């Protein structure tokens, strides 16, 4: 039976309407798949919706980054001046640190964020936070909370940093550090304890290390790219799946009694690392004086790793570092420089009184230039560094 044109039109409209109603949840799910969106619905008016998209942003030490956060609600029911914006950092699963709070014209940053954090203020509904001079300690997850009277909503943003993970143990030997001592050791070498995510990313990038170390969450793990018996065996399954390698995990350990090495993380250098080549080998004390005479300090382990990874420092000569170890960075592997893989080679911790090596120095930005008038460094003897204009070829600063 043929339908009347009018009836067909009404049925077509109802079909389209039902199709749209069914399509809305699908579109909403797709939208949530693209960005972090948290919804709290409080009726037809006054609903607060917070969006933090993208859910992860990447910066580097010394950089400036925007932690995105936008909110929307019925402005007719509430004015924007009554909205409180609060940023916090997740320091533990159930612990938070205040970062920034704003209520109308009143703004306040807290602790280490003072002078570095401010709202972006890109129009109504923008709660994004601008963070300047990013530090290693800024790495982590942040919550953006928007509160209006009894209504609130929260979005999450993760701040990641470009950098490098490096294994570390002090002169005392392997497996000597508690969790707190590992934190301190990383800080002394211009780093922080790496996160499990950072260690996993380093493993995917080829990090292979057969000694277990503390991570920032209190777990103990180690990355194995090439499975072998001394490193968990050839049949162990790590975080990467399969039996050919992975991140071996000892789980969460007693942080005051058990002792391991550390996996540290560091990021971009604000200054530069360079190598000073002596006329004759020097002891560690002489290396310290040589760097000081060049307006620099002896480089830390993390600074050398950052110069190798991020500034491509390549030098096939061992040099003293601040912790008393001797190392050298290789970007382009060659046989005479430690084997077929790039990395920072370590010669361990030689006797500091022995005259064996040159030195890797670190010069911070804005450090005063050495006194003009020759190549002298203000000290004589004690290592035989070239002085004056007598032998300018006897030292080699490598700028990166």
From Swiss-Prot:
Expressed predominantly in brain where it is found mainly throughout the midbrain and hindbrain in a perineuronal net pattern. CDD domains: Link_domain_HAPLN_module_2. Residues 47-155 form the Ig-like C2-type domain. The keyword Protein biosynthesis does not apply. Residues 1-30 form the signal peptide. Its main location: secreted. Belongs to the HAPLN family. This is Hyaluronan and proteoglycan link protein 4. It comes from Mus musculus. The lineage of its organism: Eukaryota, Metazoa, Chordata, Craniata, Vertebrata.
């Amino acid at each position: 039976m043929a339908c009347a044109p009018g009836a067909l039109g009404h049925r077509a409209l109802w079909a389209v309407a039902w199709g749209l109603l069914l399509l809305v949840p699908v579109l909403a799910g797709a939208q949530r798949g693209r960005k972090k969106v948290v919804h709290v619905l409080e009726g037809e008016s006054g609903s607060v919706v917070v969006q933090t998209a993208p859910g992860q942003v990447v910066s580097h030490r010394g950089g400036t980054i925007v932690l995105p956060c936008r909110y929307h609600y019925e402005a007719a029911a509430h004015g924007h001046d009554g909205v409180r914006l609060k940023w916090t950092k997740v320091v533990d699963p159930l612990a938070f640190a205040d970062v920034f709070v704003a209520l109308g014209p009143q703004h306040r940053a807290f602790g280490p964020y003072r002078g570095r954090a401010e709202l972006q203020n890109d129009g109504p509904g923008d709660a994004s936070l601008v963070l300047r001079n990013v530090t290693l300690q800024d790495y982590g997850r942040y919550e953006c909370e928007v509160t209006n009277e009894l209504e609130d909503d929260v979005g999450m943003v993760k701040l990641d940093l470009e950098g490098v993970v490096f294994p570390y143990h002090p002169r005392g030997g392997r497996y000597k550090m508690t969790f707190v001592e590992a934190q301190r050791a990383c800080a002394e070498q211009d780093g922080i304890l790496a996160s499990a995510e950072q260690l996993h990313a380093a493993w995917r990038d080829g990090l292979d290390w057969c000694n277990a170390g503390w991570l920032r969450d209190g777990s103990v793990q180690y990355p194995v790219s090439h499975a072998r018996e001394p490193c968990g065996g050839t049949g162990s399954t790590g975080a990467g799946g399969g039996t050919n390698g992975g991140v071996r995990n000892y789980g969460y350990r007693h942080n005051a009694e058990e002792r391991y090495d550390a996996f540290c993380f560091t990021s971009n250098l604000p200054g530069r690392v360079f190598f000073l080549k002596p006329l004759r080998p020097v002891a560690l004390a002489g290396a310290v004086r040589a760097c000081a005479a060049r307006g620099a300090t002896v480089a830390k382990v993390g600074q050398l790793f950052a110069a190798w990874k991020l500034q491509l420092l390549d030098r096939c000569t061992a040099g003293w570092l601040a912790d008393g170890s001797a190392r050298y960075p290789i970007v382009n592997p060659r046989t005479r420089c430690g084997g077929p893989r790039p990395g920072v080679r370590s010669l361990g911790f030689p006797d500091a009184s022995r005259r064996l090596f040159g030195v890797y120095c670190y010069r911070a930005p804005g450090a005063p230039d050495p006194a003009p008038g020759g190549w002298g460094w203000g000290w004589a003897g004690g290592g035989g560094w070239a002085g004056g204009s007598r032998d300018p070829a006897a030292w080699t600063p490598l700028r990166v």
